[in-house]
């Protein structure tokens, strides 16, 4: 069907009192296209529009300029949205609702303060019945599973400079004196898991936490005891330095099927200086031996195209991944999202204007550098797993496959066929198999989606 017709018909049929749009930065322009399609109904019926999410939080001056956006939610939106709806329902003025920037008919903007943190243990469960059932199916390990995200943590205790967590912490500390990072109670997590499993027949769980193993020992033990009753395979992501044999052994016994590590870059000095990730390569390699030893399948996520990076530095990332030998290795283009420390670095270096909107990190590079061109970055990305899996004696051919020429494309196609034949495992076991059954390499589509949203919280 035509989405433009669908959205226009929905607006006419539903006749909303408010249109709310939660958007990450790379989805912002699509959101504006949607608003463009409903502008006639918006103007005719005087329907206010609010936009929220991490992009609106960290680029409010930019977002509020758009003609069809009347309000911006800065920070968490659960309480602010409820307060706004209550005011609209009663026909009351809502220009002073906390967390909101409200634009009047003359274009004047009232910027309200941020209120205290939302109690994430009081939030209602996600109403999955609002969505078509096919929205619950996602790829994992070469199979399609019925799964949903379950939030266990909000925010992150670490300060990676490509991520919004440092600025999120700074914002809430300055405005409210509070730490944005917190953990949902185990009872609340259990209630949500039990509800989703019993009411919607879920087959797989993925935990929505930037660093799942930010749990301390007591909390992890509580989780494992709680999860015995759920008994579904699950996926989580964490940092290498949080891993121990004891932790992963406990999680494996209750259903840990797959996990992902954020490696990001292979050069120790560059990783520390540019990314604020202070760990030695030898320690990362040792940490990644733990899931391999236990038979837990894992993927490693890396990024390339950082400011001041070079092709040689990118090969340090390839070399480290080669030593780790994960079941799956993903690489993404650096995305200088608003609200990240590296966005400021990128602008200071003159590589982006403050108004530039960053696209998806699986898209072509927006940061154009003479020493490491977009074409080189794209070439490294497409041959990344080939460099990792094939012996170095094949690197000469792989380098040719980096080029997007007739010859390069031909060589890449041949190498890809060989790669799939030698290194691509069979799909995972069925949804009804025991959670401790053998596991295999996943299709990385799902994990790419999770990685993309690591840096961007929703409204």
Report the location of each language-model feature.
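Catalytic cores of alpha/beta
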Residues: 60-65, 247, 308-323
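Conserved strand-turn element in the central/C-terminal portion of the radical SAM core barrel
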Residues: 1, 212, 266-271, 275-277, ...
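Conserved acidic residues
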Residues: 17, 70, 203, 257, ...
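Radical SAM [4Fe-4S] cluster-binding motif and immediate context
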Residues: 126-299, 319
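Acidic, low-complexity intrinsically disordered segments
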Residues: 1-190, 199, 456
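Structural detector of well-ordered beta-strand residues that form the stable sheet scaffold
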Residues: 48-50, 73, 235, 299, ...
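Radical SAM enzyme core and accessory elements
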Residues: 8-11, 17, 105, 341, ...
């Amino acid at each position: 069907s035509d989405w433009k017709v669908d959205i226009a018909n929905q607006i006419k049929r539903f006749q909303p009192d408010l249109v709310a749009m939660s958007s990450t930065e790379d989805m912002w322009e699509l959101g504006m296209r949607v608003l463009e399609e409903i502008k006639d109904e918006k103007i005719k019926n005087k329907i206010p529009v609010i936009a929220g999410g991490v992009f609106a939080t960290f680029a409010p001056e930019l977002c509020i300029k758009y003609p069809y956006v009347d309000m911006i939610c800065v920070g968490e939106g659960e309480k602010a949205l409820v307060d706004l709806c209550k005011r609209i329902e009663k026909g009351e003025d809502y220009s002073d609702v906390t967390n909101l920037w409200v634009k009047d008919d003359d274009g004047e903007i009232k910027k309200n303060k941020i209120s205290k943190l939302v109690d994430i243990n009081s939030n209602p469960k996600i109403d999955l019945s609002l969505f078509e059932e096919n929205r619950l199916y996602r790829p994992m390990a070469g199979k399609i599973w019925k799964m949903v995200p379950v939030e266990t943590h909000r925010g992150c205790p670490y300060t990676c400079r490509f991520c919004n967590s440092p600025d999120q912490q700074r914002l809430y500390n300055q405005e409210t004196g509070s730490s944005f990072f917190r953990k949902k109670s185990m009872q609340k997590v259990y209630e949500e898991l039990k509800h989703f499993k019993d009411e919607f027949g879920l087959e797989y769980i993925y935990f929505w936490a930037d660093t799942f193993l930010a749990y301390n020992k007591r909390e992890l033990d509580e989780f494992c005891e709680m999860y015995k009753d759920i008994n579904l395979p699950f996926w989580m992501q964490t940092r290498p330095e949080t891993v121990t044999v004891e932790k992963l052994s406990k999680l494996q016994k209750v259903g840990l099927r797959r996990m992902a590590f954020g490696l990001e870059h292979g050069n120790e000095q560059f990783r520390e200086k540019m990314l604020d990730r202070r760990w030695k390569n030898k320690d990362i390699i040792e940490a990644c031996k733990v899931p391999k030893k236990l038979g837990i399948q894992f993927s490693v996520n890396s990024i390339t195209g950082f400011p001041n990076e070079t092709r040689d530095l990118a090969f340090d990332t390839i070399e480290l991944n080669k030593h780790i030998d994960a079941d799956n290795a993903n690489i993404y283009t650096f995305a200088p999202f608003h609200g990240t420390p590296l966005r400021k670095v990128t602008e200071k270096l003159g590589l982006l204007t403050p108004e530039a909107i960053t696209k998806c990190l699986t898209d072509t590079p927006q940061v154009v550098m003479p020493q490491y061109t977009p074409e080189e970055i794209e070439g490294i990305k497409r041959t990344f797993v080939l460099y990792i899996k094939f012996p170095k004696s094949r690197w000469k051919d792989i380098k040719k496959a980096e080029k997007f020429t007739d010859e390069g494309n031909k060589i890449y196609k041949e190498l890809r066929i060989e790669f799939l034949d030698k290194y691509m495992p069979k799909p995972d076991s069925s949804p009804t198999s025991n959670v401790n059954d053998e596991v295999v390499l996943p299709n990385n589509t799902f994990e790419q989606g999770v990685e993309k949203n690591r840096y961007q919280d929703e409204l």
